[in-house]
UniProtKB/Swiss-Prot annotation:
Record site feature (Important for dimerization), residues: 269
EC number(s) reported in the record: 5.1.1.7
Protein name: Diaminopimelate epimerase
Domain of life according to the entry: Bacteria
Catalytic activity as recorded in UniProt: (2S,6S)-2,6-diaminopimelate = meso-2,6-diaminopimelate
Keywords of this entry: Amino-acid biosynthesis, Cytoplasm, Isomerase, Lysine biosynthesis
GO terms for MF: diaminopimelate epimerase activity
SUPFAM superfamilies: Diaminopimelate epimerase-like (SSF54506)
Gene name for this UniProt entry: dapF
Cellular component annotations (GO), alphabetically ordered: cytosol
Protein's pathway: Amino-acid biosynthesis; L-lysine biosynthesis via DAP pathway; DL-2,6-diaminopimelate from LL-2,6-diaminopimelate: step 1/1
Residues annotated as the enzyme's active site: 74 (proton donor), 218 (proton acceptor)
Sites marked Could be important to modulate the pK values of the two catalytic cysteine residues: 160, 209
Length: 275
């Protein structure tokens, strides 16, 4: 039997598994079955806690999408990861350092129960996103057979395309997101964010996630939108990001500096399942 915990960050929901005290392995087929909301547990991503590969770190953090693919980063998941390892007694620290498949991040559990995550330095160099472009720009033209989009491209450990829209409520997220998530200029696919600027300190955002379609919240998407908006001189250093599932606070001092995300992480229930 595998013991697991169901958690969510702003409605972005996770199956979290302790791979430190349990010997676990999940095949892509098993993950797809577990992710099914009718026949399985149901989740956007599976989060796996592993022992650290680096003695200076506390844990290794792995993320699997509902389609079974492993991805580099998940911001909402990172907050749940921090609460999970504390709740399960895997650490007593309030400041937790973990490695991911894209680098190292620091998680800080706040007194009010929210979690602040040092998401690292946003990557704007196209080849490192990865994104096919001759040079780094604040805005790119992205062509599809149906339409041309103005977008920002950035990586928060995973690739993001951010498009500014007049009204996030009326945009066809599924249609546009599905057409862009596999765009040829993003060799590893891309998460597509639709950003409505309310004022320089406040945006609304919907995100079509690579491998998961639209979710109620995307932490890295919120970070990407705030960073792109700041690079385009549209947003302040601190931005409130309203997602369908709730709000996040993003702080960024600018290019070359780490970006910080603060938001909730909620425990739903503990369970066990036979694979």
């Amino acid at each position: 039997m595998i013991h697991f915990t169901k958690m969510h960050g702003l409605g972005n929901d996770f199956m979290v598994v302790d791979g430190v005290t349990q010997n676990v392995f999940f095949s892509p087929e098993q993950i797809r079955r577990l992710a099914d909301r009718n026949f399985g547990i149901g989740f956007d991503q599976l989060l796996l806690v592993e022992p650290p590969y680096d003695p200076d770190l506390d844990f290794h953090y792995r993320i699997f999408n509902a389609d079974g693919s492993e991805v580099e980063q998940c911001g909402n998941g990172a907050r749940c990861f921090a609460r999970f390892v504390r709740n399960k007694g895997l650490t007593q620290k309030n400041k937790i350092r973990v490695s991911t498949n894209s680098g190292k991040i620091t998680l800080r559990i706040e007194r009010d129960g929210n979690v602040t995550v040092n998401m690292g330095v946003p990557v704007i160099e196209p080849s490192q996103i990865p994104f096919k472009a001759k040079k780094s720009e604040k805005t790119y033209l992205l062509q599809t057979p149906m339409q041309t989009y103005l977008c920002g491209a950035i990586s928060m450990g995973n690739p993001h395309c951010v498009i500014q829209v007049e009204d996030v409520q009326t945009v066809n997220v599924d249609e546009i997101g599905s057409s862009l998530t596999r765009h040829e200029r993003f060799p590893k696919g891309v998460n597509v964010g639709f950003m409505q600027v309310i004022n320089p300190g406040h945006i609304k955002l919907r995100v079509y996630e690579r491998g998961a379609a639209e979710t109620l919240a995307c932490g890295t998407g919120a970070c990407a939108a705030a960073a792109v908006g700041q690079l385009q001189d549209k947003l302040d250093k601190q931005v409130r990001v309203d997602l369908p599932g709730g709000s996040l606070i993003i702080n960024w001092e600018g290019e070359g500096k780490p970006l910080w995300m603060t938001g909730p992480a909620e425990h739903v229930y503990d369970g066990q399942i036979q694979l």
